[in-house]
Amino acid sequence: MTKNGLIQKSIKVLFLRGSGVVLLFLFTMFLTNYYSAELVGKYDFVRSTIMILSGVSLIGTNQAIIYYSGFLKSKNSLESIKNIYVKMLMMTTALCLLFILGYAMLPEEFINELFNKQEAHSLILKSIAALFFYTTTMLNIDTLRALNKTISSELYRNIFRYTPIFIFSIILYYTQNQEWLIEAFLASFLLLSLTTLIQVGLLFKKLNLPKNNDYNFSYHQIFARSYPMALSAIAYFIMQSVDIIILTAYEGFESIAYYSVAVKLATVTALALMSVNIVIAPKIAEIYSTNDFDKLNKLINDSAKIIFIISVPVLIILFVSSGFMLGLFGANYVLAKEALLLLLGG
């Protein structure tokens, strides 16, 4: 991949990511201005819970399939990826079932006392019940990327991921059924898991049938490759969401709503990093498999320059206009200004 090609593709992905951020903030602004802060806080608690749980249930398969894609492309055997995907889907499904069984053994009183909230047990239960659909959606999104459908992958990750719940939330508001917000959020992933599963299945049908010399990886080999990636993913989700989980035990859901908006604004600074990574990850795996480390170093250096050039202006704008930005979500959300500045400084 040339530097110009990297820049052009990164800009396309960045545009989709930027559009996704705009959509996310429009949705968040709608919630914070038309739903109670308590309900928004419950929604953010459920969203954070399912993100952390999915880091475990995915066990790195969504990242590992990118590696296998690059490896198989370098061996001219991409059609072998179908069997890998099916095994990954079986692995993640088994883990989701284990979560359900494990949580069923925990006393309701214990969970409620742990989080100091009467609704904590039911909110987590709903998250676990929808975990399979959320996990499958995330795996399918990266499978699309592994199958050279980067734009489709980013459309799901950044646009379609928020569109159903945005529409549902508007319907719930105008029908005076706001209390169903969390159920609508979780149900949106049932819809997304089905649509992505259909698209992935259609793409697999277009691949050539496996040949006798194609690569076949066992469950153990896939797990050995994916679990180190799971550790980094879990660490990322914990860093992104554990503060909201911990805050739940000490503050009301209203405070969680205020703080969560600050977190969303702070994550905008990582937009360039994520956009470039989306583009270069399959290429890194492909180049690494050929042992062309000079080419690999050049790709990484070019990527780092692009990330720096895009990130710094965004960081400065957020620092200068933090109060104004928070005010868009409602008057009370300005209370999170200090938290936002601390997050940006970190």
Which sequence ranges carry the predicted segments?
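Helix-loop junctions and terminal segments of transmembrane helices
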Residues: T28, I59-S74, A146, A262, ...
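Membrane-interface junctions at transmembrane-helix termini in multi-pass inner-membrane proteins
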Residues: I7, F133-Y156, L341-G345
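Interhelical loop/hinge segments that connect adjacent transmembrane helices in multipass membrane
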Residues: M1-L6, E113, Y174, Q178-F185, ...
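Interfacial segments at transmembrane-helix termini and the short loops linking adjacent helices
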Residues: P107-S127, F253, D294, N301, ...
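Hydrophobic alpha-helical transmembrane segments
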Residues: H121, L125, L155-K205
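Transmembrane helix-bundle signature of multi-pass secondary active exporters and lipid flippases
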Residues: Y43, R47-L58, S232, Y236, ...
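Membrane-water interface segments that mark the loop-to-transmembrane alpha-helix transition
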Residues: Q8-V21, V46, I59-E108, S122, ...
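Signature of the first transmembrane helix
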Residues: G5-I66, I100, A104, Y227-F253
